């Protein structure tokens, strides 16, 4: 089963400095049929104006993954971490017992991100933050794991959840496959381009909610960049 969730039907909040679309219930947007997708709780599509951002605010017991689509985001937190994550790269924050952080677009242009929240396997762990650049060429034509709860994914950023975040870039006409074990779900969003997944078409920034599909064949109808989250 693959359900398409068109971009123009997502939850929407425009605060001037922040133009946000919500794939799942978030803040003032509530849809009882879109509370979560397995352990995936939030997928926000955020456009952050130059010189603005999120002032210090707290989180607790959530795995928060930020994928930068365009521009860069600068993070600072109560643990003393500070870092800048650029387009195509990922940062992970395990909120654990509690962390206060800020995220600002210090660039001269709009920054566009996907922010993803995944429910952790357990509560009350120590908070932490990490960021990592990923060579863009490695994901040409094949899925590359960016963040994972599997210790064997040693090249990926670690998250404390039974989940995986992967990305692929495809030229028009090119395909890549992703295998899902029995009972697991996936959620895909083409950051750019247009794709077809097992016969279901999605345009840029649409969501595809997937379950009961052992193999996903992702075909680019035009040059595309795709982000996928696999969860229990």
Swiss-Prot record:
GO MF terms listed in the record are: metal ion binding; quercetin 2,3-dioxygenase activity
Q: How is the cofactor bound?
A: Binds 1 divalent metal cation.
The cross-references to SUPFAM superfamilies, in alphabetical order and at most eight, read: RmlC-like cupins
Q: Which cofactor does it need?
A: a divalent metal cation
Pathway of this protein?
Flavonoid metabolism; quercetin degradation
Please tell me whether the keyword Metal-binding is annotated for this protein.
Answer: yes
Q: Which residues form the signal peptide?
A: none
List the catalytic activities from the record: quercetin + O2 = 2-(3,4-dihydroxybenzoyloxy)-4,6-dihydroxybenzoate + CO
Residues annotated for a divalent metal cation binding in this entry: 57, 59, 101, 103
This enzyme's EC code(s): 1.13.11.24
Note the CDD domains from the entry: cupin_Yhhw_N
| Cited function | Putative quercetin 2,3-dioxygenase.
Question: What is the designated name of this protein?
Answer: Putative quercetin 2,3-dioxygenase PA1210
